[in-house]
UniProtKB/Swiss-Prot annotation:
Function: E2 conjugating enzyme that catalyzes the covalent conjugation of the C-terminal Gly of ATG8-like proteins (GABARAP, GABARAPL1, GABARAPL2 or MAP1LC3A) to the amino group of phosphatidylethanolamine (PE)-containing lipids in the membrane resulting in membrane-bound ATG8-like proteins which is one of the key steps in the development of autophagic isolation membranes during autophagosome formation. Cycles back and forth between binding to ATG7 for loading with the ATG8-like proteins and binding to E3 enzyme, composed of ATG12, ATG5 and ATG16L1 to promote ATG8-like proteins lipidation.
Gene symbol of the encoding locus: atg3
Protein species of origin: Xenopus laevis
Matching PANTHER family: UBIQUITIN-LIKE-CONJUGATING ENZYME ATG3
This protein's record includes keyword GTP-binding: no
Domain statement: The membrane-curvature-sensing motif targets curved membranes.
Family: Belongs to the ATG3 family.
Quaternary state and interactors: Homdimer. Interacts with ATG7; this interaction forms an E1-E2 complex that is essential for the transfer of GABARAP thioester from ATG7 to ATG3 and disrupts interaction with the E3 enzyme complex. Interacts with ATG12; this interaction is ATG7-dependent, essential for phosphatidylethanolamine (PE)-conjugated ATG8-like proteins formation and also mediates the autoconjugation of ATG12 on ATG3. Interacts with the E3 enzyme complex composed of 4 sets of ATG12-ATG5 and ATG16L1 (400 kDa); this interaction disrupts interaction with ATG7 and promotes ATG8-like proteins lipidation.
Name listed for the protein in its UniProt record: Ubiquitin-like-conjugating enzyme ATG3
Length: 313
């Protein structure tokens, strides 16, 4: 039933997006939405600091006229996913309800990281260090689920003030991925089953919601496409079929992909902007995608995509 509802809703939103005029005046600070021009600026900033991300044109027949032909969307490929979400340690104390009034019980950050510095000291200045984001494609940021999973549940403000924007120096050399993907025939039993998967991730501009939108498609260790049920194993179960739905990519041919629905993105970003402003700082729109990739990690906590970890509020 949920799949049928999502399909009908998706078709309705396609029509609504087609009829929605292109946003031309910036409303980033007021509402958290962005114009296509601001999406381009944020995308250029992401590509500059995280070279594993690149602009792409997609299919010529699906080009959106409000974006340059060669900058229709962003993509990063062969992103490692070493384990399934159910393999992560989890308890109710780690949940944080991000939004409660969306009709689906809120956006739950199942693997919320706590124990970080508060907003009083942190929301004073935005700094960006670029040396650890990967000047080559050999460096991919690692999900820091090993050390930060302990602590009490936090509310929306705690999530925005610290959990989204914490410092993290961890990186991994992707040259190890090839070695990890070799069959381990000598182990025997369940240990011989290779867990590593890879994902292609895409960020598009959603004209209806006027925010970025994340798409992902997964492959097994032999680079064979994963079934939808298999991809759901790498998504927080609180978000499957709710925050995450299966839809056609707006710029690429089938098969359909998993997509993180953008209906809450602007609201979350607006609250982050307000938090920064309350601390005397100012969040530039060019930082949008870096922060966006940070907060959607709650949905796909085991997919280790690249984004700048070295920015503090």
């Amino acid at each position: 039933m949920q799949n049928v509802f999502n399909t009908v809703k998706g078709k309705a939103l396609e029509v609504a997006e087609y009829l929605t005029p292109v946003l031309k005046e910036s409303k980033f600070k007021e509402t958290g939405v962005i114009t296509p021009e601001e999406f381009l600026a944020a995308g250029d900033h992401l590509v500059h600091h995280c070279p594993t991300w690149q602009w792409s044109a997609g299919e010529e027949s699906k080009i959106k006229p409000y974006l340059p032909n060669d900058k229709q969307f962003l993509m990063t490929k062969n992103v490692p996913c070493y384990k399934r979400c159910k393999q992560m340690e989890y308890s109710d104390e780690q949940e944080a309800i991000i939004e409660e009034d969306d009709g689906d019980g809120g956006w739950v950050d199942t693997f919320h990281h706590t124990g970080l510095s508060g907003v009083t000291e942190a929301v004073k200045e935005i700094t960006l260090e670029t040396q650890d984001c990967g000047k080559t494609t050999d460096n991919i940021a690692v999900c820091d689920d090993d050390d930060d999973d302990e602590g009490e549940a936090a509310d929306m403000e705690d999530y925005e003030e610290s959990g989204l924007l914490e410092n993290d120096d961890a990186t991994v050399d992707t040259s190890k991925i090839k070695e990890a993907c070799k069959p381990k025939a000598d182990l025997g039993g369940e240990d011989a089953i290779l867990q590593t998967r890879t994902y292609d991730l895409y960020i598009t501009y959603d004209k209806y919601y006027q925010t970025p939108r994340l798409w992902l498609f997964g492959y097994d260790e032999q680079r064979r496409p994963l079934a939808v049920e298999n991809m759901y194993e790498d998504i927080s179960q609180d978000h499957v079929k709710k925050t995450v739905t299966i839809e056609n990519h707006p710029h690429l041919p089938p098969p359909p992909m998993c997509s993180v629905h953008p209906c809450r993105h602007a609201e979350v970003m607006k609250k982050i902007i307000e938090t920064v402003a309350e601390g005397g700082g100012e969040l530039g729109v060019h930082m949008y995608l870096l922060i966006f990739l940070k907060f959607v990690q709650a949905v796909i906590p085991t997919i280790e995509y690249d984004y700048t970890r070295h920015f503090t509020m």
